[in-house]
Each structure stands twice: as C-alpha cells, then as structure tokens.
C-alpha cells in the first residue's frame, strides 16, 4: 500500500497542499480572496476568513493534522453563500454566475 504524503487543507479555498507548500500558498490565496471579494457587490462581500486555531499535541510542537484539516475545511466552507432561489451554496463570485440561469421550480 502506497502512503500519500501528508496534505494540509487551505482554510481559504479548501484545497489540499503539501506541508511545505501550504505556507507559500496561503498568503497568495488570501491576496486573491481579497481581490475577488472587493469586486463583489457590497451585499455579497464576506468577512476575511480567519485561520483556525488548533493546539499542538506533542511536546515538539506538532499539530494534529486531522484536526487542523477539519478546522480548515469548515472555515473554507463557511464562506459559501446560499442561492435565494434554489438554496444551493456557492462561493460569492460563483453565485452571481449561477443566479443568471437559476429559475424557480414551476408549481405542479
């Protein structure tokens, strides 16, 4: 059985990155998030995502990777906004695109 290298979930976008590259990715992802958030209409703008705090579990200062990833995934998904027509959730910039084609269900 082949073991995958440990991956860390980005708390901003929810994607997985290697333990070495996450520290490079997060500042770039946050900058992109700010740029995209500033382009949204005021009513769709979101508060800045906060990096989840997970306590170290060993004397050497290691983190519980599963707990860290769970907290990051929850943080990333808390930014989703529901469509006021169908209720599906989207990132705010994708909600605008979705709403162009979302139609209320016809009454039976």
Curated annotation (Swiss-Prot):
InterPro entries cross-referenced by the UniProt entry = ZC2HC1A/B-like, Znf_C2HC_C3H
Instruction: Kindly list the GO molecular function terms attached to this UniProt entry.
Output: zinc ion binding
- Write out the residues that bind Zn(2+) 2: 83, 86, 98, 102
Entry keyword set: Metal-binding, Repeat, Zinc, Zinc-finger
Please, which domain of life does this record's source organism belong to? Answer: Eukaryota
User: Which residues make up the binding site for Zn(2+) 1?
Assistant: 10, 13, 25, 29
Encoding gene, per UniProt annotation: ZNF475
Name of the protein in question: Zinc finger protein 475
The C2HC/C3H-type zinc-finger regions cover: 6-35, 79-108
- Looking at the keywords, is Thylakoid present? no
Q: Which Pfam families match?
A: zf-C2HC_2
Q: Does this entry carry the keyword Magnesium?
A: no
Xref: PROSITE patterns: ZF_C2HC_C3H
